[in-house]
């Protein structure tokens, strides 16, 4: 083995060892989410929210593959007849945040839903979608008042990141738009949460 290829092997091995030490998903019951491609994480979110609606007896039709348009369409489906865009993110190991790519025209659907998956729980956030003006304004997000929506170069796609602590904080406000799932959360709690927000 040449000195150069040996150096590359050693560098890859060192990075792999760091990665193994940082594996926050190692003991998670849904640890396979960490190995999925980003678009498949999105499909997990869509199918999971559809499943929650079915378990709750809430009318829903969700299949983002049939509603997509370049730059963003009218959402991934409908819940209670209302259009909903669903964004699913997993907690990053090196960057402890949930990163949501919102597309170029995220204001088209009536509602936005974030499913933020952590190793030991998940957060479901649903809110009436923002207007085009709100997305472009650089003002704080009304449902996450310490954050702003990122609009890349004022012409591309929009992005919004949350964190575990931010979700916990927002779940504690009165009439919260964020729900924390734990082992004790019942399907009735989820049903009441969805029905309270999507009207």
Across the structure, where does each feature detected by a protein language model lie?
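Nucleic-acid endonuclease domains
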Residues: 1-82, 87-199
């Amino acid at each position: 083995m040449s000195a150069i290829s040996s150096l590359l092997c050693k560098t890859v091995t060192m990075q792999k060892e760091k990665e193994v030490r940082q594996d926050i998903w190692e003991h998670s019951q849904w640890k396979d989410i960490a190995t999925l491609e980003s678009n498949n994480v999105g499909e997990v979110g869509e199918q999971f929210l559809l499943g929650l609606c079915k378990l709750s007896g809430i009318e829903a039709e969700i299949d983002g593959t049939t509603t997509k348009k370049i730059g963003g369409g009218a959402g991934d489906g409908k819940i209670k007849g209302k259009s909903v865009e669903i964004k699913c993110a997993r907690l990053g190991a090196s960057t402890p945040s949930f990163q949501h790519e919102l597309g170029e025209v995220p204001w088209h659907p009536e509602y936005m839903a974030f499913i933020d998956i952590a190793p030991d729980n998940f957060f479901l956030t649903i809110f009436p979608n923002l207007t085009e003006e709100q997305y472009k304004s650089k003002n704080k997000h009304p449902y996450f008042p310490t954050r702003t929506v990122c609009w890349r170069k004022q012409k591309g796609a929009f992005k919004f990141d949350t964190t575990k602590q931010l979700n916990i904080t927002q779940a504690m406000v009165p009439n919260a738009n964020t729900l924390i799932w734990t082992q004790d959360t019942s399907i009735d709690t989820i049903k009441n949460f969805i029905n309270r927000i999507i009207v």
